Regions:
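Flexible, acidic loop-helix segments that line cofactor/substrate-binding pockets
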Residues: 1-27, 43-58, 74-78, 141-144
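Acidic, glycine-rich loop-and-strand cores that form catalytic or ligand-binding grooves
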Residues: 36
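Conserved C-terminal structural/oligomerization subdomain of aldehyde/semialdehyde dehydrogenase
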Residues: 50-161
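Flexible, glycine/charged-enriched surface loops at secondary-structure junctions
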Residues: 3-10, 39-43, 106-112, 130-134
Length: 161
């Protein structure tokens, strides 16, 4: 992926909102690394972009694999995707953990099992629930971005699942 100036059509990911956000996100990523979590970051090197990274608030897109949902204590607003693998018989408990967290902005599930889709969509208390698709929603500062509990700014942008 290409990280840099969002004004270029070839850019996949731009900067985060400010220096404080960058610091908090990078601290979270480092904490997960120090706990031994698998952390994957993907950015294609480009000399023009690399110059921008030095002065901007860029954070590389990051995937972190968690052993348990309980490892997340707060929402992370940035290009970070947390992946939790679970056994099928543990799904009800996982949904309960998500619902009990107090946060419920966005949840994504990828599965080919209709029963799993029904169980998640029927039980998860989140504002934005995406099934087998990318997890994008509203334009920040332009559209409301719905959530549940301590998350979101209003009703969900866009249509159904």
């Amino acid at each position: 992926c290409r990280m840099g100036n969002p004004g270029r059509l070839t850019t996949d990911i731009g900067p985060v909102i400010d220096g404080e956000a960058k610091t908090n996100i990078e601290r979270h990523i480092q904490t997960m690394r120090s706990k031994g979590r698998p952390v994957f970051q993907a950015v294609r090197e480009n000399s023009e972009d690399a110059r921008e990274w030095q002065s901007g608030t860029f954070v590389a897109p990051t995937l972190i694999e968690l052993d348990d949902f309980a490892e997340l204590q707060k929402e992370v607003f940035g290009p970070v995707l947390h992946v939790v693998r679970y056994n099928r018989n543990q799904l009800p408990e996982l949904i309960e953990q998500i619902n009990a967290s107090g946060y419920g902005l966005t949840l994504g599930v990828h599965t080919r099992i209709d029963e799993t889709i029904a169980q998640v969509t029927g039980s998860a208390q989140v504002g934005n629930l995406y099934v087998n698709r990318n997890m994008v929603g509203a334009v920040v500062g332009v559209q409301p971005f719905g959530g549940e509990g301590l998350s979101g700014t209003g009703p969900k942008a866009g249509g159904p699942l």
